[in-house]
Amino acid sequence: MSKSAVSPMMQQYLGIKAQHTDKLVFYRMGDFYEMFFDDAVEAAKLLDITLTTRGQVDGEPVKMAGVPFHAAEQYLARLVKLGKSVAICEQVGEVGAGKGPVERKVVRIVTPGTLTDSALLEDKETNRIVAVSPDKKYIGLAWASLQSGEFKTKLTTVDKLDDELARLQAAEILLPDSKNAPQLQTASGVTRLNAWQFAADAGEKLLTEYFGCQDLRGFGLDGKEHAVAIGAAGALLNYIRLTQNLMPQHLDGLSLETDSQYIGMDAATRRNLEITQTLSGKKSPTLMSTLDLCATHMGSRLLALWLHHPLRNRAHIRARQEAVAALESQYKPLQCRLKSIADIERIAARIAVGNARPRDLAALRDSLFALSEIELSAECSSLLGTLKAVFPENLSTAEQLRQAILPEPSVWLKDGNVINHGFHPELDELRRIQNHGDEFLLDLEAKERERTGLSTLKVEFNRVHGFYIELSKTQAEQAPADYQRRQTLKNAERFITPELKAFEDKVLTAQEQALALEKQLFDGVLKNLQTALPQLQKAAKAAAALDVLSTFSALAKERNFVRPEFADYPVIHIENGRHPVVEQQVRHFTANHTDLDHKHRLMLLTGPNMGGKSTYMRQVALIVLLAHTGCFVPADAATIGPIDQIFTRIGASDDLASNRSTFMVEMSETAYILHHATEQSLVLMDEVGRGTSTFDGLALAHAVAEHLLQKNKSFSLFATHYFELTYLPEAHTAAVNMHLSALEQGQDIVFLHQIQPGPAGKSYGIAVAKLAGLPVRALKSAQKHLNGLENQAAANRPQLDIFSTMPSEKGDEPNVGNFVDKAEEKHFEGILAAALEKLDPDSLTPREALSELYRLKDLCKSVS
């Protein structure tokens, strides 16, 4: 493309676009942001806006699409959600100031991970950007949130990278554009940077300059040991500087995070427990949506953070528990007060990057005054006392804002009426000139009528022609000589006089000067607030923590959550535990006990489909998770020993992108658990071995259960439909059989959802199929085949003895030749017990009793 063949304006655009080839360029032209060439085509498709043309280049029409300046935020939000980055190119020069096009430059770059504008952000979600820097042994992670000032780093490994990214919920991921960059499960939101930007030396230099220190040891970072983490942090800080066109002043130090701080949860566990997103990708009903009674958006974001980061430090947990207990009698007035608090965290972020608006400062002022008035009773905990002590520290800032900003300023600075009266004498004088113009006009009108004797004379103003004197057509010819004609109308003439012209110049000049002065003063206020940013961030964090703790108190009081106890020995004891989400969705929820300790580490859970096995297992995990956030738990009582990780293998689907079947996904998740679970881990395993042949599945399920018992020794809830596994407690005393009960009523089934000792009597699969609406013919066929299979199994037991030839690890033959016999015996006992349990001898007639006796005899024949 020849530059001589394009206009000066298009040459300017092409020069700017050449510096941002990987981004859409919003090029400001008057009241629109325009896009050209391929940007226009892509934007028109993504935003569903009109694609048009403007002029030609090399004989071809130039594609063009645009969005209005005043509505740009909604379009930016849509592009960012699609993972696009946008360079905002503004007019920075004066129109007509010189030859050629108006001077323009890119003032900021909007990317998914560097947003600060509230219109582009979800109120209750933290927006993070993560940098990933690999070497041969470790992967360095660094992440930041421009909204909160969070800035952290960590060393991890390749096999844990996707789990870390799931925990951080990154909106944008920075990767080196090199061959050794790790492969991620997701490609969305990934930005490739030159590999040299991740160099540790350059990173350390940038970080030490930013924090004003000689080295990074004070942050727990050693130059050699943490080289990749330092490289990631340096690349991240430099990226933020480039996109924001300035170095942010509000990043809250740099801290090194370790695995020992939080209970570990891999990506599958976070997904299966539906902490902040359902399995179908929705935001409700989840643990977060169910517990979120927060009064502020800051509190909601912190609650999500706590749920994804359950603590291991018992002292910190107990401090939160004490605060929750102290607030139980005063959380209602506290939450009422907190509802008036604006999003201080995000306002501080906008101040830091220089794009705060007038009403941001007004909301900040009002919020700081409101926080200083929060009162807590004398019995408050030490944590509450620490949080409350932060608020008075910002009173001087609130007072400065009260003096500087009008009580209700304009939305936009360009409209004026932002700076308070009395803040600046010159501004007050300019406003007086503007605001007292009406008095001058009335006086002038009265004086001119008296001087000329013209009764139709009026002095008025409009935006097109400014100030003027209007006379009717009949009196216009009598106008004095000093009246200069300005406009002719059908029934009137408009004039200007030297006196009125002088006043007009004075008013218009005053208006321009006032707007310019207000902008100057507002920028000065923003600059002064930069020094207050650390205190503002402390206030935001304290208010958010107070909000979450008061929410925990509300849950304890209104939903009967109890304070869990912590033990130093291995135990998970829960009395009448409830699923915190499900109990809010149903009228009646059946509470259940859980007892695991050093003697009983694996609960073998059997029972019918729809019986509640998965709900029960998730319930136990969520109670353990909640206890480690400092929240009280949905139970009558709970005692929990040391927990380091929570693992789940509950349900799965094909991973088509990686060409992995459902069974492969399940086995991969199972393998990860067996490799990483420890004696202090909680493991949930649901129907291991399904998706392959019966014998393969049974063999795998048996092997996994044994591995958990003998090698991992984790606390495990192991749900299965393989009744043959219920022999395990006889071979392993650390295993215990439990089942979810059900009751047959004629041809119908009632799920009791009650955990009871022993194995289940049967699986009730056909009964569940009936509930699902299978045709009667199919149900009858299924029952017929089931009866045949059961009879065949009973007549040919040896064919099911699949473990009789399995060598043990020591090489000797295990004594499990009677494995199936024992399993079937237990199966029969369960069926018989269930049948007897239903009977009420006192209510049976003699004929009914005899009929039941024959039915039981037939039952014995069919199973024996």
Curated annotation (Swiss-Prot):
Pfam family, one: MutS_III
Protein's name according to its UniProt entry: DNA mismatch repair protein MutS
UniProt xrefs under CDD domains: ABC_MutS1
SUPFAM superfamilies: DNA repair protein MutS, domain I, DNA repair protein MutS, domain II, DNA repair protein MutS, domain III, P-loop containing nucleoside triphosphate hydrolases
Family listed: Belongs to the DNA mismatch repair MutS family.
Gene name of this polypeptide: mutS
Keywords assigned: ATP-binding, DNA damage, DNA repair, DNA-binding, Nucleotide-binding
GO biological process, alphabetically ordered: mismatch repair
HAMAP family named in the record: MutS (MF_00096)
NCBIfam families, per the entry: mutS1, PRK05399.1
Residues noted as binding ATP in the record, renumbered to the chain: G607, P608, N609, M610, G611, G612, K613, S614
Any GO molecular function: ATP binding
UniProt function note: This protein is involved in the repair of mismatches in DNA. It is possible that it carries out the mismatch recognition step. This protein has a weak ATPase activity.
Membrane-spanning parts: none
Domain of life of the organism encoding this protein: Bacteria
Organism: Neisseria meningitidis serogroup B (strain ATCC BAA-335 / MC58)
Cellular component, GO annotation: cytosol
